[in-house]
């Protein structure tokens, strides 16, 4: 593997262990030329997943789109980056466990909302307001009422 510091290809693995998510392997490497250390992750290659958009267009699955939406929803909330990454990992695992080659974007959105609802109600409402495209205040208020009713059960 090429060293990210000096560009030489003489590197060796000095430590290898399962990563936090147990679906990848974290490897600590050292360059034989410059002696600097760096970390790499090895992950199982998954079958390519295609997302069916609302307009029926198809595009390759892109984890960063889910991350961006969740990060926006959690902005200025007491939610750590680790919690957000764990949520996105859960969403991704759920999607891949469907074992479908094509997944509608609305299914992905529902999975994200389900995970966000249990993490933070405000982040959930923020995500839902964009995802569900609330047309007016009444629709927005109805969704808030559902959340409040659910919390008081």
UniProtKB/Swiss-Prot annotation:
Keywords: ATP-binding, DNA-binding, Metal-binding, Nucleotide-binding, Repressor, Transcription, Transcription regulation, Zinc, Zinc-finger. PANTHER family: TRANSCRIPTIONAL REPRESSOR NRDR. This is Transcriptional repressor NrdR. One of its GO terms (biological process) is negative regulation of DNA-templated transcription. The keyword Transmembrane does not apply. PROSITE patterns: ATP_CONE. One of its GO terms (molecular function) is DNA binding. Binds 1 zinc ion. Negatively regulates transcription of bacterial ribonucleotide reductase nrd genes and operons by binding to NrdR-boxes. It comes from Lachnoclostridium phytofermentans (strain ATCC 700394 / DSM 18823 / ISDg). The keyword Lipid metabolism does not apply. Its cofactor is Zn(2+). Residues 49-139 form the ATP-cone domain. A zinc finger (unnamed) spans 3-34. Belongs to the NrdR family. It comes from the Bacteria. The lineage of its organism: Bacteria, Bacillati, Bacillota, Clostridia, Lachnospirales.
